[in-house]
Amino acid sequence: MRTAVVVALLGLGAFAVAAGLVLQLHTYPLLAKLQHNINTTSVSEGEGVTAVVYPPGGVPEIRHGLRVTATTHVEGDLAAPEIKKNGDVTVWKRATIVKEESAKLVLSAEVRRICLDRRTAEAVAPCHGEFYETERGKRITAEGRQLLQPGLNFLFPFDTEQRDYRWYDTVLKKPVDIHFDGEQLLQGLDVYRFVHTVPPTALERLEVPGSLIGRPESSVDVTRYYRVTRTLLVEPTTGAVLSVREDIRQELRTATQGEGEGTAVFNGELRLTNASVTANADEVKKNLPKLFMITTLPVALWVLGAVLVAIGLVLLFLHRRGLVAGALALVAGVCLAGTITYGVTNASSPDSSLDLKNVVSSTNVDYGLR
């Protein structure tokens, strides 16, 4: 009997090590990918905001104490040529509209389309049809292998690290460093906090009505400046951004004005609503068990395999009193091996239910109006 137990322990030990390798080398690349068919909506809100508004038929004016909402819709462009089952690139489009709630006036809007590496979440090129548009009819498109919106745009990579990343700022139109700032708990999830501050930065020169900045002239030359402090809470295993807070100031300065002396055309804080944060957290909680199997479990399997092999070797040199411990280890090994086998065989790609044969182009995403 001892010989049978020894052989079984050695076999299970080898199986556990092999299963760990399968999870790490096969199942991880299969599951740890951004989905093609994303379709989400989130809302950010701000109270007491100062902003320039554009009344219908009137002239732009500065209003204070506004309640502002920013609605963002993200969906996958399944008709894009880059989309392939189990491929490494996906294509997402994002539409955002910012409104002042009392009069339902639109303050700003944008539409973006971008190709993403499904593992790192970074923008990639070439990307057929990549663009951004912040004014209707004035679309900026990528040419050739140009990377129009580099860096991270929507998410962080799987297994996010405690280090700096490059986050694309849609106002600056370029990526900026965002810094790891600590850990905290959010709705039962351990998250990483990333923060950066963009100092007041000149964006463009404009000619605006003098009345907008309290001047008697019919028009005045000004420069628009932008500053933001952005805080993102990221679930590190999935790279999902669960919460966003942005303290934003944009002001118009004349040639003689310094920092803080200009006219604020947007000043306030926008943060993701509790409902949106909860929806993000619930989605992560649904996916974490799958990813646990392919991140933590391989290490446990390697350790278990080594222990089982060690027990088997020890039993080769022990008498019958070692058989009880060996039998218990064997039973534990069989149970765990069965669990692992079930998990590996039932792991499915996020593309397994995706139908790419009858998709219709979704180019109608329009300024978040869904």
Label every model-predicted segment.
Residues 2-8, 290-347:
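Juxtamembrane interface at the cytosolic side of transmembrane helices
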Residues 127-142, 190-196, 201, 260:
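N-terminal short leaders/motifs
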Residues 214-315:
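Membrane-proximal extracellular "stem/stalk" segments
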